[in-house]
Design a protein with these regions (language model features):
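N-terminal helix-turn-helix DNA-binding module of bacterial transcription factors
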Residues: 1-80
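Alpha-helical recognition/docking segments in bacterial nutrient-uptake
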Residues: 1-20, 83-188, 192, 252, ...
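Periplasmic-binding protein-like
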Residues: 133, 137-145, 197-201, 233, ...
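Flexible loop/turn connectors
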Residues: 228, 249-356
Length: 356
């Protein structure tokens, strides 16, 4: 029989491992000489200003001696209220997502546990994989760059907020980045530098945000009179090595076509281009101007530093968490959808130092 009073089963400290026993909050309370409510406050990190230092120390010593572990999921099931929030995101080795997570935690960490569900880099979240997580009965979901199909399958099951999915159904609470304006700013910058032929290195992915970046770049190129031939659009995985290989393959034809500027779907693509350019002895930016997206931390310290579209990932995470908190409290987020502005940070990969 399983009672959810906030404890997990462990082996007894008596040495009799044949009969595991549940260490409960009541046992900790008796050991420390305090109430179970006091144990709950200390164990859940809510004792500040509510429990005396002496009692807190006694509870912590009892927890350590007895091996008490809070069973958050069990407690949530018993109360009918979950304390688990799941963030579904691509490859978290990308520093962009570290900033998103920091923003989410700044809002939810005091009351919720954040669980990460990681998809393959640049791949839209899978509804079938996410359904497995729903078995944990989370309070809500934060989903980065889902497809419309994902929203149709998962969207009605529990509170959910979408991040960075421009163009996706407007009925879901969302926080988007103005990536279209960012792409236009890149093209405007190229035009101001006198470039008339450009190429674009896209990401092999089904995510809407990257499709919007590409289409906005191509549209703006036409508006500014910059030619982008169909053969001047290539793609690779969001990976430095893959991007380097893709650029190396296409550069001979791009050079022959007179390409002098290259837009990249992400800064990871731009890193790959710079790596290949050194091998191929291409001078950046004298022979080829290169701009990226996301303004990752290393973009400012690469050689040359990368011109990039800056997206406020931490603020995006914070706003998404605020919208989810509103949903969890039974309120409608205001506004339902938010758009964060982007900004172009100009560096040495597109202009020679002193010409900015």
């Amino acid at each position: 029989m399983c009672d959810y009073d906030g404890a997990m089963t462990i082996a007894e400290k008596t040495g009799n491992h044949r009969e595991p026993r549940r260490v409960t909050a009541a046992m900790v309370a008796a050991h420390a000489g305090v109430s179970t409510a006091t144990v709950s406050l200390v164990a859940n990190g809510k004792s500040s200003g509510r429990v005396s230092a002496k009692n807190e120390q006694r509870v912590r010593e009892a927890i350590r001696e007895l091996g008490y572990i809070v069973d958050s999921i069990g407690s949530s099931l018993a109360k009918g209220v979950s304390s688990l929030v799941v963030l579904v995101a691509p490859d978290i080795s990308n520093p962009f997502f570290a900033k998103v997570i920091a923003g989410v935690r700044s809002v939810l960490a005091s009351d919720y546990q954040l669980m990460l569900s990681v998809t393959d880099a640049g791949v839209s979240p899978s509804a079938s994989e996410t359904r497995k997580i729903l078995g944990l009965r989370p309070a809500g979901l934060l989903v980065h760059a889902p497809s419309q199909e994902f929203l149709e399958e998962i969207g009605g099951n529990l509170p959910m907020v979408v991040l960075d999915a421009p163009g996706i159904s407007a009925k879901f609470p969302a926080v988007n980045m103005d990536v279209a304006q960012g792409a236009r700013d890149v093209v405007a910058h190229f035009a101001a530098q006198g470039h008339t032929r450009a190429a674009y290195l896209d990401a092999i992915t089904g995510t809407e945000t990257l499709a919007v970046r590409r289409e906005a770049f191509l549209q703006a190129a036409g508006d500014f009179g910059i030619e982008v031939l169909p053969s001047s659009v290539a793609s690779s995985m969001i990976d430095v090595t893959a991007a380097s290989a893709a650029f190396s393959e296409h550069w001979p034809s791009w050079k022959k076509a007179g390409v002098t500027a290259l837009g990249c779907a992400t800064d990871n693509h731009a890193f790959g281009v710079l790596h290949a350019a050194r091998t191929l002895q291409i001078r950046i930016p004298q022979q080829l101007a290169v701009a990226g997206f996301d303004d990752l931390p290393y973009s400012a310290t690469s050689n040359p530093a990368i011109t990039s579209v800056q997206l406020n990932a931490q603020e995006g995470g914070r706003l998404a968490a605020l919208k989810l908190r509103s949903l969890l409290e039974g309120k409608s987020p205001e506004p339902l959808q938010s758009m964060l502005p982007s900004s172009l940070v100009v560096r040495g990969s597109t202009v020679i130092d002193g010409d900015r």
